[in-house]
């Protein structure tokens, strides 16, 4: 099977609804073996909001295959914190997440960051380890919407 061509670009305001739906599909599919139904419901029950739309518009990067949005990710270039890395379930395992992580790491290096960090969902930690991240301790991610989820804080030193 031929590997699909993945293109990356900065998100636009019009991409926000698609990014929101992709996020929810990725969570419900990818996290279903590591989180309870109640946790998944809390995680995905929020409404599409102006705040999310603004975050996508100003911070998200998108991965596309054949002009279809199949992945998201963002990095805070002041803190090195990576967030919102989500991949469409039907293309998981086809290099989309890896390509997004390389892109975000390139941005971090260009900004002069010494390290990058993220809070990995329990199911995603093995993937991030393959990308050079370290961390094994389970912690709690505190959602701004008032609930918490187990996660694994991870860090990667950039050389």
Identify what each model region corresponds to:
Residues 58, 132-133:
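Short glycine-aromatic motifs
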Residues 10-16, 21-90, 101-103, 107, ...:
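Acetyl-CoA-dependent GNAT
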Residues 48-51, 139-143:
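Short, P/G- and charge-enriched loop/turn segments at secondary-structure junctions
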Residues 108-121:
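Conserved GNAT acetyl-CoA-binding A-motif
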């Amino acid at each position: 099977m031929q590997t699909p061509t993945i293109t990356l670009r900065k998100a636009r305001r019009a991409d926000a609804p698609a990014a929101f739906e992709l996020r929810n599909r990725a969570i419900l599919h990818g996290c279903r073996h590591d989180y309870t139904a109640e946790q998944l419901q809390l995680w995905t029950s929020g409404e599409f909001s102006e705040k999310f739309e603004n975050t996508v518009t100003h911070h998200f990067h998108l991965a596309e295959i054949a002009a279809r949005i199949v992945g998201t990710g963002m990095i805070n270039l002041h803190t090195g914190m990576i967030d919102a890395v989500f991949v469409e379930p039907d293309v998981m395992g086809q290099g989309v997440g890896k390509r997004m992580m390389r892109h975000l790491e390139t941005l971090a290096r260009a900004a002069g960051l010494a390290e990058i960090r993220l809070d990995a969902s329990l199911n995603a930690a093995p993937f991030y380890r393959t990308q050079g991240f370290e961390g094994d301790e389970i912690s709690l991610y505190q959602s701004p919407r008032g609930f918490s989820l187990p996660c694994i804080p991870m860090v990667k030193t950039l050389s």
